[in-house]
Amino acid sequence: MFRWAIIFAVIALLASLLGFGGVAGLSQNFAYIFLVVAVILFIIGFISRRT
């Protein structure tokens, strides 16, 4: 999940540098969603291993 978040963050950065505002915004949203999901899954996995 972190890998996908980084990939979409890089796509957003490149798209914004090239002037594609819509693509940059969409890629940024996907990167944020993947990052949040990855953090939530990490926390759930960490808690389930401790109990």
UniProtKB/Swiss-Prot annotation:
User: One short Pfam family name for this protein?
Assistant: DUF1328
Query: Where in or outside the cell?
Result: Cell membrane
Among its keywords, does the record have Disulfide bond? no
Where are the bilayer-spanning segments? 6-26, 27-47
GO CC terms: plasma membrane
Tell me the membrane topology, using the record's own terms. Answer: Multi-pass membrane protein
Q: Which domain of life is it from?
A: Bacteria
Where does the UniProt entry say this protein principally localizes?
membrane
Sorted keywords for this record are:
Cell membrane, Membrane, Transmembrane, Transmembrane helix
Q: Which family does it belong to?
A: Belongs to the UPF0391 family.
Q: What is this protein called?
A: UPF0391 membrane protein PsycPRwf_2202
- Give the source lineage, highest ranks first: Bacteria, Pseudomonadati, Pseudomonadota, Gammaproteobacteria, Moraxellales
